[in-house]
């Protein structure tokens, strides 16, 4: 350091005067270029505000990742650039040149060069880190657990940049005055050394960015990661929920970020953890052991993490490319001797522009779907059916909730990857009503298949008298028992099917309509007429068949086909604009029917084994809203619960405002408790509808034993509704 200071004090004159005459041809240091000064001042102010904003925003993040911390260090580089350019502007002010101006020129040039090297090296480091985490089966912890390592890497980059920038103080090269500030002497061989360092960083960044660009920005299908079925069953937490609430998996189209990721081997990958196609299972398991408390795939944190990788890739390429003209100009001037002051000034302004783009990274927290579909022409809805009507192979978790010619399906699926198209049942064609089947009915015990399929159909619902013949297209896959933490095995069976016996006229009328927050038109009430006035419903009509209250949200039939231990319940909730605070809106909810059908115990079942059944529940919900603004806050929550009343599995809510599914926590209640007031205060009905598989098993057993004498709780509820309807008509 003493050597640097001595050289800085004794050699300032030579460092500056060596090439002084070459820089005052058109714009001497004492002449002020008002246009350049004003433009530099504006860009410097923008860089100052942006760097402070991005630094504060990134440091205030609750779940900081390695990517966000590295970008935060970028903001520090931007502040360093602001300081150096501020000195440049001071040097441009017309005045006599005192001795300390030489010191300022050397200091500002050193800082300018140091932040440039640091920014470019960190860009390469960021892209390398993203490439490593996306193509290796290695888990990476959040920055909060590796803050020391991240800080060490950042300090190392800064130290290396400072060392390389300070070489002119040791006698190799010199800093000279320019019309816009100060820069290294381009006639020195030191410029070639800098260009080699930049070229290596640039080449590595471009080489790694090519596969990442396709993976993060231009892939037709976002990367996806299989979470273990048992992990999903335990539930998960989301931002805004207490730590003790468990862990929630959000299963939404946006939350699945890329096509080539594999199952994590039953772990909870971190927000930066993904597994590439070539990663062995052992590597994934080892990564899980290193990080048992990471962020689950599909959660909001995981989605933001993938968005951060997208924005970091774009910013890294932007910063390095904006420095390219300056480096090329320096090399050309060194090799050929050609010097163009306008080109040099323009190159300087581009490097200054590179310091103003860092705040764009903060957008990754909210705009998780960008830049796909916006900056890059990506296929935003990778779950829609191809226009040519061909079947699209689907794998892993799949979701689709749409209105297309009065027909829409929402699916949840979980399976291992199948390479054979004909063995994959997870495709969806909205234009026909063919059954989705699997052609491999019996698989070896080494193959694992766990599937949950939820269908939300907006086609006309069937009366209770016709429900028995619904499940006509059914195939069953025998699954392998998976070993749990207690080394006990549960056999899961999956029964898939759907309400597909609908008239063709259902699919030939009306244009395509999709649930989207961009749609400002209100639903045509005539489209919903079929959903009212059924035998087990309370009609919501006035005279003239007009709704008493405007209809909003969603109404239809929900069908669940699940392995043993799962059933489905559906309810509606009011959600805040941020999509995190969930408040039950009990006054706006009316459940008309929740009836389990197709509950058939296994014929080979014995009292000593766990009952293996396939439960199918139809739950119809009609929500009545008092105001039109509720359209932006209404969500549909499908809750899949286990037989245990103490364990709740993930729940999904569909937000019309956000146009996607997100996860939520509904608490530990395992049943609906409905209070039905009647005209007689003593005759009020309070019914508890079970929401567990075990309760449905008991109901099914009693129904087979007692035959006509037994009624489920939901049947009592329907009876109460009819009684209330008769009382209202009588009055």
UniProtKB/Swiss-Prot annotation:
UniProt membrane topology term: Multi-pass membrane protein
GO molecular function, one term: neuropeptide binding
Transmembrane segments: 36-56, 70-90, 110-132, 156-176, 190-210, 311-331, 343-363
Record-level GO cellular component terms: neuron projection; plasma membrane
Major site of localization recorded for this protein: membrane
Keywords tagged on the record: Cell membrane, Disulfide bond, G-protein coupled receptor, Glycoprotein, Membrane, Receptor, Transducer, Transmembrane, Transmembrane helix
Residue ranges, annotated region (Disordered): 234-271, 475-526
Localisation: Cell membrane
Residues listed as glycosylation sites in the UniProt record: 7, 11, 21
Extracellular domain ranges by topology: 1-35, 91-109, 177-189, 332-342
SUPFAM superfamilies named in the record: Family A G protein-coupled receptor-like
Disulfide bonds: 105-182
Record field: compositional bias (Basic and acidic residues): 479-497, 510-526
Any single biological process term in GO: negative regulation of ovulation
PANTHER family: G-PROTEIN COUPLED RECEPTOR 149-RELATED (PTHR24229:SF32), NEUROPEPTIDES RECEPTOR (PTHR24229)
Protein's job: Orphan receptor.
Family: Belongs to the G-protein coupled receptor 1 family.
Name of the protein in question: Probable G-protein coupled receptor 149
Species assigned in the record: Homo sapiens (Human)
